[in-house]
UniProtKB/Swiss-Prot annotation:
Protein name per the record: Novel plant SNARE 13
GO molecular function: SNAP receptor activity
Location of Phosphoserine modifications: S74
Main location: membrane
Coiled-coil residue windows: 33-94
Topological domains annotated Cytoplasmic: 1-217
Top-rank lineage group of the source organism: Eukaryota
Vesicular topological domain residue ranges: 239-269
Domain t-SNARE coiled-coil homology: from-to ranges: 146-208
Transmembrane domains' residue ranges: 218-238
GO BP of this protein: protein transport
InterPro entries: NPSN/SNAP25-like_N_SNARE (IPR044766), T_SNARE_dom (IPR000727)
Keywords carried by this UniProt record: Coiled coil, Membrane, Phosphoprotein, Protein transport, Transmembrane, Transmembrane helix, Transport
Length: 269
């Protein structure tokens, strides 16, 4: 359906580039399913992310061109082109969601395995604890239990502080990353706008150049006609009896000199 839409050459070129990127994304995700190595999967995902970023830029450029040509198209054509734009946006969003799924799966695979080898522990065994407890009085047992509880409470408090500090650092890092992401988004949008303006300016310069060349040709042709007319007028004035040159319409030939007949009086009588 999209190939039969009435598009300008500029819109058709952008639309073709977007469709090429979509085909590359589909093939890339199919290859990703066959890759088992995590490092190669990460590299493949980075390449697909770059293609999705380029797709996003092209969709924005397609939207700008569509708005620029909206006044020259019929309402029906504008509706069809807008529907095609929404379809491309949905397709791009589906690839973005698929990328997030693969990123989550890849992150779950990166789990470190610890070797829990059997070794000599520095903690006393249960048998040793029973022997020590049997030799202690009740007050000593209470004091030892309170000391162990205090140590446990202190360890829990230290763990809470570490968790709070980690959350604070994570929140600050997320805020910084969000600010940097927003700034990069604004920079990308600004660059897209500049690129679009440069293309429009180039098209305008080409159009002006064609108009100037046409005007020069017309002026040169008119100049040759004027020179020819002036040359014919000069030749007719200098040599009025030249029959090889036809008279110019609207230009009367030079008046003949009058010849008066002189008669003598007696001849007249």
């Amino acid at each position: 359906m999209a190939s039969n839409l009435p598009m300008s050459p500029q819109l058709e070129q952008i639309h073709g580039e977007i469709r090429d990127h979509f085909r590359a994304l589909a093939n890339g995700f199919q290859r990703l399913d066959k890759i088992k190595d995590s490092t190669r999967q990460s590299k493949q995902l980075e390449e697909l992310t770059d293609k999705m970023r380029e797709c996003k830029r092209l969709v924005k450029e397609f939207d700008r061109e569509l708005k620029d040509e909206e006044a020259r198209n019929s309402p029906e054509v504008n509706k069809q082109l807008n529907d095609e734009k929404q379809s491309m946006i949905k397709e791009l969003n589906s690839y973005v969601a698929l990328r997030k799924t693969y990123m989550s799966t890849l992150g779950n695979k990166k789990v470190e395995l610890f070797d829990m080898g059997a070794g000599v522990s520095g903690e006393p065994t249960a048998e040793e604890n029973v022997q020590v407890a049997s030799s202690m009085s009740n007050q000593e047992l209470v004091d030892a239990g309170m000391k162990r509880m205090d140590e446990t409470d202190q360890a829990i408090e230290r763990s809470k502080q570490v968790v709070e500090q980690t959350l604070e650092v994570g929140t600050q890092t997320a805020a910084n990353l969000k600010g940097q992401t927003d700034q990069m988004g604004r920079v990308v949008n600004h660059l897209d706008t500049i690129q679009f303006s440069i293309k429009k300016a180039s098209q305008l310069v080409k159009e002006i150049g064609r108009q100037v060349a046409t005007d020069k040709c017309i002026m040169g042709f008119l100049f040759l006609i004027v020179c020819g007319v002036v040359a014919i007028i000069i030749v007719k004035i200098v040599n009025p009896n030249n029959k090889d040159i036809r008279d110019i319409p609207g230009l009367a030939p030079p008046a003949q000199s009058r010849k008066l007949l002189y008669l003598r009086n007696q001849d007249y009588m």
